[in-house]
Amino acid sequence: MKRQLLVALIFMLCASWSKASIDPQKVKPVKNIILMVSDGTSFSTISLARWLQYYQDPSKPKLNLDPYLCGTVRTNCSDAPIGDSAPTTSCYVTGHASRAGYVASYPPDMGAANIDPIDPKKSYGPMATLLEAAKQLQGKSTGFVVTCEFPHATPADVSAHYYNRGYYDGISEQQVHNNLDVVIAGGNNYLNQEQENYLKEHGYTVCRNDIAGMRNCKSDKMWALFNGTSMAYEIDRDPSKEPSLAEGVGIALSKLSKNKKGFFLLVEGSKVDWANHANDPASVGPEFLAFDKAIGTAVEFAKKDGNTAVIIVADHATGGMSIGKASLRNYSKRSKAELFQPILNFKMSLDALGAKLNSEPYENLRPVFKEYTGIDLSDEEVNLIIHSKGYNNSPIPKEQRKEQQDKPLYSPSFSGLLSKILTDHTCLAWTTGGHTGEDVYLGCYNPKGQVPLGMNTNVELAHYMQALFGLYGKIDQFSDDIFTCHDVAFNGLDYKVEKAKDKGSFPKLIVKNSANGKMMTISAFSNIAQISGSESKVIEIASVMPYVDRTDKFYVPKDMAKYLK
């Protein structure tokens, strides 16, 4: 009998493990959510950052993250176990996994490759995000603070929709028109003058490379952009020109928290991922430690506020980094100084080091390398450098060089070579310059005490966050309401799609009501419709209206035809 009871108990426990660790229907709502994503972060990345911090300051053996670690997340695409930044955070904020490259957009049916069931009728269409629901259904303030350019995958995931994460023109247009309250990011190159004018006309302060302006901004509606593309790696950052991630979070919270209805804030340590893509031993640790300081800022606010939940998670892992490698003999017996001091000798990122070497004559190669890395280059290493086509001062003509390194995703090919040289002098190793498929960490602070434990799927984490805003089970219907195919929304009316006239323009949807002569013109990716007829007017709606070329459809609110009555 006892044996039967034991077997029954084990069966019950196993059955419970297959369910979500916390029932979203029992989660008590909070007023505010801070979603913090460290892009491309493996457990090894966190361990390295923690060791570097402790080695430099023994009074700090733990990260700000550590008290709130509560489980792991299985993060994946809709048709592939290894995630991409676009669909992974997209899943966290929509509740649906999607394909690599898809920004808050529904995936196509890939047959046997599907990990979750797919409705083919929804393929390529936009999916509403938790940020959009918080703004439109609950009147909350919204924004994001990131270190990449603002149309990059993760910030785009919460504020735009398209199946191609690289379509910055359409993504940035949606972000400008999606009523975000605060944006602090890189990416001056991607905000054009027309978009800046639109923001200013709608009460925003726009700060471009103006850290003082950002700090002194009194408006609760602000865009602050730094650099042409991404912000600098933390190890290279000039504090007089760019804010830290923690400072950006503090400024955003001071503005968003003025809304009595609450807020949703996305924070991304964007370049943890970039450093791992580049296999950059100099940048990975400092980049995550900068994110960890932002965690401290966010949690401190949340504890004082008493009605704010902080969700801390990676979207996927990158690089396959290990601490310890076969080529480092007896590494398990080496002291922390032997393992970590060589990394701390690196004074700049690989990209910055490459630029520095290219700014100096060849005669200075060895002393400059020694100054910024602590490494005395061997003859073999010098030979590798002078054969790199990315080294501008090589005594060997480019056509005679025999380059031996691939180009990293976000960095010059020269950085790839420098990665090999620097990494050879450390305890670190990487398996890839791409993403990896292991589960990622999860940390949560909830003033109500309810946090997901153990292993959670990306969809389950999405449901938990929806429940924190009392929106569990409501996001899909909201998505259907604001993103209806134009042929359904305007059924019975005359309509046509006008293709973009040039690269800098967007398609237009023209709808006519022949009964009263009214006509509506919608420019893709905006929230604006022009009405003409007996009287002309411009209306601005709460949601953006994306156009998808693969379906040749605009996606508009289901009641949009009311403006033509």
Predicted regions and their residues:
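Cleaved targeting-peptide boundary
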Residues: 20-26
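Structural beta-sheet core signal
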Residues: 35-36, 144, 312
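Extracytoplasmic mature domains of secreted/periplasmic and thylakoid-lumen proteins
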Residues: 96-180, 187
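A post-motif C-terminal structural segment
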Residues: 30-32, 41-47, 51-94, 99, ...
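Active-site-adjacent structural elements in enzyme catalytic domains
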Residues: 28-40, 44-45, 50, 122-137
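Sec-dependent N-terminal signal peptides
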Residues: 4-13
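N-terminal signal peptide c-region/cleavage motif recognized by signal peptidases
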Residues: 15-18
